[in-house]
Amino acid sequence: MNYLKTSGIVIKEVNTGEADRIITIFSKNKGKISALAKGARRPKSHLVAGTQLLCYSEFVLFKGKDMYTVNSCDVIESFYDIRNDLERLTYAAHMMDIVNDVILENQPASRLLQLFLNSLYMLSKTDRSPLQIVRVFEIRLLSTMGYAPWVSSCIKCGSTVFDSMYFSFLKCGFLCSKCLENDKGALKISEGAAKALNYIVHSKMSNLFSFEVSESVLDELGKVSQRYMKERLEKNYTKLDFIKTLDRIKC
């Protein structure tokens, strides 16, 4: 029987049978993998820890006729702080939905995996704004997938005067006020938002989250990211709507 040893993070789980669990793993070696974790829901199972949602583990998988079976798993990072906090878990669930849609079976996506893990680490271990972490994740994910918008200058004339920029969803990048013409769907953005977008798209992964923005700029990033993502991925992600419900409860 063939086996595969790979690190990966659980991005989806479905209970099956009396005590089994089918998990979807975002793996380093094979992209998306579906695997059966037999008995993983039993409290004393050696698989119970490493097969939980958001657990990043080292897996040994046996390849069966229809899917892999989990033979063993050793936890590398459990992201317990996220799973134990409803608000953080909601942000993480939003990112998991996106990841589950864009990765493919037998298609390694190491840069996307690193982005996802870094985003979860920031969400779990720092006091950075969860919403900013998510917006950075969304924009950088699209860029990594090949949908990077042109955000270093006006896509038409090359102007770098960021205080008069619009984000064109038709042109997939910046247009200055002189080149805007009849692009009625373009979104006027501030200099701060323009610089933030440029940073997110072009910065090194190690420095991706090392900046802060005002609430108004974060709101602009959200408007760009949500619409750009909806048009490129052809889906409207709604899990973050639950955050508004939580905010109302807190008030």
Swiss-Prot record:
Gene3D superfamilies: Nucleic acid-binding proteins (2.40.50.140), Recombination protein O, C-terminal domain (1.20.1440.120), Recombination protein O, zinc-binding domain (6.20.220.20). One of its GO terms (cellular component) is bacterial nucleoid. Keywords: DNA damage, DNA recombination, DNA repair. InterPro entries: ARFGAP/RecO, DNA_rep/recomb_RecO_N, NA-bd_OB-fold, RecO, RecO_C. GO terms for biological process: DNA recombination; double-strand break repair. It holds the Pfam family RecO_C. It comes from the Bacteria. PANTHER family: DNA REPAIR PROTEIN RECO. NCBIfam families: reco. Involved in DNA repair and RecF pathway recombination. Belongs to the RecO family. This is DNA repair protein RecO. It comes from Acetivibrio thermocellus (strain ATCC 27405 / DSM 1237 / JCM 9322 / NBRC 103400 / NCIMB 10682 / NRRL B-4536 / VPI 7372) (Clostridium thermocellum). The gene is recO.
